[in-house]
Amino acid sequence: MVKLRLKRCGRKQRAVYRIVAIDVRSRREGKDLRKVGFYDPIKNQTYLNVPAILYFLEKGAQPTGTVQDILKKAEVFKELRPNQPKFN
């Protein structure tokens, strides 16, 4: 099973995160399938590769809670096809 989750980067006390598609059994810092975005909580910046995110969501990838909140704020779920499952 594939999940969309955050992968920590940056230095001590200054974390930035990559949003990645990764196998559930992998570690947080493990090998990812594809990088699909970037999130900086300190500057409150996000970059999302929306076509790649939609591809993984259509294939059944499950976003984690934090990634789901980021995607909701960016209104990515509105771009899913109507027959795809909705995420709360």
Curated annotation (Swiss-Prot):
It comes from Atropa belladonna. The keyword Chloroplast applies. The gene is rps16. HAMAP family: Ribosomal_bS16. This is Small ribosomal subunit protein bS16c. Keywords: Chloroplast, Plastid, Ribonucleoprotein, Ribosomal protein. It is found in: Plastid, Chloroplast. GO terms for molecular function: structural constituent of ribosome. Belongs to the bacterial ribosomal protein bS16 family. Signal peptide: none annotated.
